[in-house]
Structures are given as C-alpha cells and as structure tokens.
Regions:
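Extended hydrophobic leader/signal-anchor segments used for secretion and membrane insertion
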Residues: 1-137
Length: 137
C-alpha cells in the first residue's frame, strides 16, 4: 500500500459513480481533508465527504432541496476534525483501496509496511521468491 498525505487526489466517489462519472482509473480531482480544513456544503461535497462527516459526527448528514442538516441543524460549512490518508493498492484494476472505501482516518493507521510479503509474476502468475521479505525502499 502507498500512503499519500493531504494533497489533491482523485478518490472516493467509488468506481461506477453515475453523478461525477469517475472510473477506477480516472478519479478526481478530490481534496483529501486534514484536521481544521473547512468545506462549503454543496451537492458535490455532500457526495464526496458525507461518509467522513457522518463518521466524525456519529450522526446522519441529510440533504434536502439543496440544504444540508447535521444533528438536526442546517450546516453551510463543515470543519474536519481528523487527518485522512489515501490508501492505494499497487494494482490499479484489482485493488480494494480508498477508491472503494474512502480515506482512512489517521488514528486507524497502526503500522508501516517495511517488507514485501508476496510478489507474483504478472505473466506466469508464479510467486517471485527472490522478492519475498525484501525491504521496501
């Protein structure tokens, strides 16, 4: 997995999205929020950030006729409370990563990849024994 921190990254409208029409390979642009970042609530931001806001607030973010409600109150802006990371797999077409499940809150990161655990030859589908347990540079 690759960790990418706080940059303009195309993610999180899930492959197959019919509104933004992003694909698995052509995502974005999407701003990866950090603690203290503020967004204006609109239809696009609702689509992109709803899951993060609901996770932070532990409540549903409701959209109704161009207005947005959280905890029973209308919201025009939202200030993020956490830092988020994009987790990207090394195989664009066959990775279940942040393009599917969204940005990962910083507090959920518990380690750092340091070794290659498994490596397969893309042509023969055989394990590349010479790469297993090599350090990641």
């Amino acid at each position: 997995m690759v960790l990418i921190k706080a940059a303009l990254i195309g993610i999180f409208a899930y492959p197959g999205d019919t509104i933004l029409k992003w694909s698995i390979k052509d995502f974005g642009p999407f701003y990866l929020p950090s603690r203290g970042d503020t967004i204006v609530m609109d239809d696009k931001h609702y689509l992109l950030y709803r899951n993060l806001i609901e996770w932070e607030q532990q409540d549903k973010l409701i959209a109704s006729n161009g207005h947005f409600y959280l905890n029973g109150r209308e919201v025009e802006h939202y200030v993020f409370m956490h830092n988020y990371y994009f987790m990207g797999g090394d195989n664009c077409y066959n990775s279940q990563d942040s393009r599917y499940w969204g940005p990962l809150p910083e507090e959920y990161i518990v380690g750092k990849a340091t070794l290659i655990w498994k490596s397969k030859n893309r042509v023969t589908d055989e394990i590349c024994m010479d790469r297993i347990f090599k350090k990641i540079k």
